C-alpha cells in the first residue's frame, strides 16, 4: 500500500503518474480514506491520520486526471460525492507535505518501478538507471512505528541524506 507523491502538488503528481499507478493510487488512497485496509498501523495509513481533508483532495485530483485521460469517471469518484468535507480540518496540513527527502524518495521508487516512463518526467532529472542502487531500498515513511521495517527504511533514508548532504 502506498500513496505516491513525487511532488507536494497533487495536480502535478496526478499528471506525472503512469496509467497503472494512477488507477492504483485512486483505489489505495480510497481504501485508506474509508478505513478498508488490512491494518491501520501501516505507515501509508498513519501518514494520513488527521489529514482526511487533504487525502480526499488527493483522491479527487487523481479522479479528475483519470477522467481527463480516459474520458470516464472512476467508480470511486461517486463515493467521494457523499463525503461531508466540512467535518474535516482543512487547515491542518500534513507536516511531511513539502519535505524534500520524502518527495525525492517517492521519485526514486517510481523510477525503480518504471524507469523508461518516469525518467523523462519533470522533477526526475539527474537520476540515472545505473545510480538507482545508490539510494536506500524501501520508502522514506514520514510516520512509522518503531522497530518495524518501515522505521528501518525511514532511518536508512535519513542516514543516506545525512551522508550525501541532501
Describe each region flagged by the PLM.
Residues 1-166:
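Expand to "…catalyze enediolate/carbanion chemistry for C-C bond making/breaking, isomerization
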Amino acid at each position: 500500500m502506498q500513496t505516491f507523491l513525487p511532488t507536494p502538488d497533487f495536480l502535478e503528481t496526478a499528471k506525472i503518474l503512469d496509467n497503472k499507478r494512477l488507477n492504483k493510487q485512486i483505489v489505495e488512497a480510497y481504501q485508506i480514506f474509508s478505513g478498508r485496509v488490512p491494518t491501520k498501523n501501516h505507515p501509508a495509513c498513519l501518514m494520513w491520520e488527521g489529514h482526511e481533508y487533504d487525502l480526499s483532495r488527493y483522491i479527487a485530483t487523481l479522479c479528475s486526471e483519470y477522467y481527463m485521460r480516459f474520458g470516464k469517471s472512476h467508480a470511486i469518484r461517486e463515493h467521494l460525492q457523499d463525503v461531508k468535507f466540512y467535518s474535516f480540518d482543512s487547515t491542518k496540513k500534513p507536516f511531511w507535505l513539502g519535505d524534500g527527502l520524502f518527495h525525492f524518495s517517492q521519485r526514486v521508487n517510481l523510477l525503480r518501478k518504471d524507469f523508461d516512463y518516469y525518467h523523462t518526467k519533470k522533477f526526475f532529472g539527474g537520476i540515472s538507471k545505473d545510480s538507482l542502487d545508490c539510494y536506500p531500498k524501501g520508502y522514506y515513511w514520514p510516520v512509522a512505528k518503531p522497530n518495524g521495517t518501515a522505521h528501518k527504511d525511514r532511518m536508512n533514508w535519513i542516514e543516506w541524506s545525512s551522508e550525501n548532504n541532501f
